[in-house]
């Protein structure tokens, strides 16, 4: 990135593909309506047995802290690929961490703290080739959840001025999302009595009304049930049902 001299930056993983007109479509869009800082496109998941198109659930432009909020709770795709960035977003003070998961998310969180204008185009421009070694197939344990959340919290505090005094709440948004991912994995052991989880519940209680604007009742119910070790089988059953529902909705939307 330090050697890049162009106006824009786009990312391509080594085993993925760009559609022939992806850069043309995205560069044409980034200058519209007074100019955007980021343009996002849809992508195609390519597996051995099938291909599937994934469209962003968000289509309206984002400004201010909207991109940060969406990135922290993963309501949009948080990858670096599938996006076109203005070069200057990567200048002056982006930290890079040797993480095995969430590297793209961490960069996008830091960029989001710069309050970019973001535009979404209804164009399938990126072909994501999924392999058994893909990062979303790697083990995700409680220790890594705690590590990642601590790094995010540190970055949010570093950008506290641009976050208008809401760094603590945005750190909570991230913790709820990442711990929910841990809880939703059936093989994850119960850790509801750990300090990280107890602090999470305490913060969630203080920001209960605010969290309702970002997370569903079902998501918050899972966190409440997770308080009790005996409820772990119920949590696993509910998360399985929610996962099936999400998968069905995606298939019907194609």
Feature-to-residue mapping (PLM):
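Nucleotide-sugar donor-binding/catalytic module of glycosyltransferases
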Residues: 1-150, 154, 158-159, 252
């Amino acid at each position: 990135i330090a050697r890049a001299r162009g106006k824009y930056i786009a990312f391509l993983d080594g085993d993925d593909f760009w559609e022939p007109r992806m850069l043309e479509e995205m560069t044409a869009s980034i200058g519209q309506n007074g100019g955007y800082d980021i343009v996002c496109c849809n992508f195609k998941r390519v597996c051995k047995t099938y291909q599937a198109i994934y469209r962003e659930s968000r289509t309206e432009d984002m400004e201010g802290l909207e991109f940060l909020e969406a990135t922290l709770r993963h309501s949009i795709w948080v990858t670096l690929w599938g996006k076109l960035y203005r070069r200057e977003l990567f200048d002056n003070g982006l930290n890079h961490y040797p993480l095995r998961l969430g590297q793209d998310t961490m960069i996008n969180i830091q960029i989001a703290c710069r309050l970019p204008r973001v535009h979404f185009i209804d164009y399938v421009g990126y072909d994501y080739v999924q392999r058994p070694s893909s990062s979303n197939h790697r083990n995700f344990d409680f220790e890594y959840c705690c590590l990642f959340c601590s790094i995010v919290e540190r970055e949010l505090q570093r950008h506290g001025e641009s976050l208008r005094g809401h760094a603590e709440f945005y750190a909570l948004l991230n913790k709820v999302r990442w711990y929910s991912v841990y809880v939703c994995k059936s093989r994850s052991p119960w850790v509801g009595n750990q300090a990280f989880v107890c602090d999470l519940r305490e913060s969630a209680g203080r920001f209960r009304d605010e969290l309702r604007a970002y997370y569903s009742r079902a998501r918050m119910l899972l966190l409440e049930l997770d308080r009790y070790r005996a409820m772990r089988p119920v949590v696993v059953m509910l998360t399985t049902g929610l996962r099936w529902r999400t998968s069905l909705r995606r298939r019907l939307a194609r």
